Design a protein with these regions (language model features):
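Solvent-exposed alpha-helices and their adjacent loops that cap or buttress functional pockets
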Residues: 3-7, 56-59, 78, 126-130
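Generic secondary-structure signature for well-ordered alpha-helical cores
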Residues: 10, 14-18, 62, 79-83, ...
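Short beta-strand segments
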Residues: 12-16, 67-68, 137
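Glycine-rich beta-alpha junction loops
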Residues: 18, 71, 91-94, 138-142
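Active-site glycine-rich loop that binds ribose-phosphate moieties when present
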Residues: 34-60, 66-73
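Active-site rim beta-loop-alpha module in soluble metabolic enzymes
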Residues: 58-64, 68-112
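C-terminal accessory domains and tails appended to enzymatic cores
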Residues: 105, 111-179
């Protein structure tokens, strides 16, 4: 979703994002693939697409200034960087969501984006960890077995594999190949 992002961008805005796979914050929560994965953990924490893409932006020095989506993803964004402006447009409750009116959502998003872009957006830059340890939990043990053949991947249980690197691009490459 951020494959065209490069250093020429001033900022990254994320609209319509959702909580990480296995989260109860949204019945549609997933990370990259709900049909293949239970969850992804990055350095021991559940990883969302927001986090994966934010780290990709960080490799290029592009700040993540705005996130909208469910309440869970907005809380995660502010945990990663309290300066990221967020707008929660829905809240997951069991197998459903409670959403604000679409016109109100558009209005809040527009106001928040205009506001954050007038501020010092450098405060929204995300610091990358020095090392990355990714755990993938597959729904099917055969997918984990297949993924275990990726160079550097270690199978740690029938459904889970782990990959480590100091280079975030290698993490992205691995995700592209095994998910």
């Amino acid at each position: 979703m951020v494959q065209e992002l490069d250093k020429s961008f001033d900022a990254l805005l994320m609209i319509g994002y959702h909580s990480f796979g296995s989260s109860s914050s949204n019945p549609l929560s997933h990370t990259l693939s709900s049909s293949i994965l239970n969850y992804i953990k990055l350095n021991g924490e559940y990883a969302s697409e927001f986090l994966i893409h934010s780290y990709a932006a960080a490799t290029m020095g592009v700040p993540v200034v705005f996130v909208s989506g469910d309440e869970g993803i907005c809380k995660e964004a502010n945990k990663v960087n309290k300066n990221i402006k967020t707008v929660a447009v829905n809240k997951g409750v069991g197998n459903s969501v409670i959403s604000i009116h679409p016109r109100l959502a558009v209005e809040k998003i527009k106001e928040s984006v205009e506001s954050i872009l007038k501020e010092d957006i450098d405060k929204c830059k995300i610091k990358l960890p020095e090392h990355f340890k990714v755990e993938l939990s597959f729904r099917n043990h055969t997918k984990a077995f297949k993924a275990s053949f990726y160079p550097g991947m270690e199978q740690i249980s029938s459904t889970n594999v782990v990959f480590e690197s100091d280079d975030y691009f290698e993490i992205l490459r691995m995700l592209l190949f095994v998910v």
